[in-house]
Amino acid sequence: MRTFRLLISMTLIFIVAQADDPRLKNASREDRNGWISIHLAGTPSEIGFQHGYLLAPEIDDVLRMYAYYINGSVKKDWSFFREAAERLFWPKLEKEYQDEILGIVEGLKARGYAYDNIDITALNGNIELVSYYLPYLANKIKADSMNNRAPGYCSAFIATGSYTEDGKIVIAHNNWSEYVVGQRWNVIADIVPVKGHRILMDCMPGFIHSGDDFAINDAGLLYTETTITQFKGFDETGLPEFMRARKAAQYGESIDDFIRIMKTGNNGAYANDWLVGDTKTNEIARVELGLKNTRVWRTTDGMYVGSNFASDEALIKEETTFDPKNSTSSPNARKLRWEQIVGRHKGKVNAELAKEFEGDHFDALAGKEQMNRCVICGHNDRDPIGTAEFSWPPFFPAGAVQGKMTTTSLAKEMKLWARMGHPCGEDFLAKPFFELHPEFAWQGKFLRDMKGQPWTMFEAKGK
């Protein structure tokens, strides 16, 4: 017992001593309503060190979860993705992002965790590697042998002009993902780099980008996205999407900047319909970014919605296996609901309605309230059919795991609203779920309760 107490005391002394590190002077962490709010400021290496130090236990948890979950899902161990990240991503990262990742590693080491830059790079690029690079390799060997791997992440909208209450931008997004992953998408990061613009975004522990993509900056740029269902394509010579998305948040000052940054070196991975706004002009855009095809819609008076459906006919035909005519698919069913919402709420859209939209349970196909794959606040764990287009079988534990929204007025003050857990506020409880669905018990090592939380305001504070 005395030895145990001595070890605990020594550990606490070590942590306190490290907390006196001058690199942590401008950093902070606060836990609120299921979220971890962090403030990071300084050079790339300082920002990375602060991130790694403040979120060390959570980064360790996320890395262990991913190694376990990915192996269980696609039968590839972490070493495969490390090798790919080291070869395809690390050499192409701009120096400031390499330095930030190396800083994260140093912060982790200061807390006693032995990960390296390749682990953190693979973590940041895991969606690109698991859902785009791996299918690309498999389909090169045997055509169409690994389709339907592009993740079905998210329901979102952006509106402006006569569609909103004040004529300015309203933007909102909920994250659809496997619950074992999404319940860890619980960081709000306020980043003040020495170069570029201040960023406020959600992310996972260890991410240098948002990942599900909801970000605003102090130049007036804001963006979100929904993934393109059943997209196929990857360019090994391209730049990692996670770096381009971070760069757009840090250096973008306009919609044109965003498009240029995202298109430069496009590797096709994490192909999305991006919803982008500029609070200086209240112009919005929908940027449908495939590998071969890109289409842009722009307006100062309209509402663009997303639920993982592509709109450009050439992109759908040439780069996906998506069926736009299948009304029972999750993307198309949610698209129908979005169309109803747009028609009924034109001229009224504001912050409170945005929160309601992201927690919406009305199944437009069935004409009633339900919890399933067809509603904006998705609950695949309640769906007896499942979401085949995302490779989610019946009752697979996945769906909407959190939501965010902001407006022109809020974004100009670097503020956003966020809700951890289902945006509708429903709890997901692991034990009763596994009792009903033991086929998913293998996820029990990391899948835990996901309690509903209130909408909470976050804002950039300090220098």
Predicted regions located by residue number:
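Sec-dependent signal peptide recognition
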Residues: R2-S9
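Active-site-adjacent segment of 2-oxoglutarate/Fe(II) JmjC oxygenases
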Residues: T300-S329
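Hydrophobic h-region of N-terminal signal peptides that target proteins for export
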Residues: M10-Q18
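N-terminal mature-domain region immediately after signal-peptide cleavage
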Residues: A19-D256, K263-G268, L275-T300, S327-K463
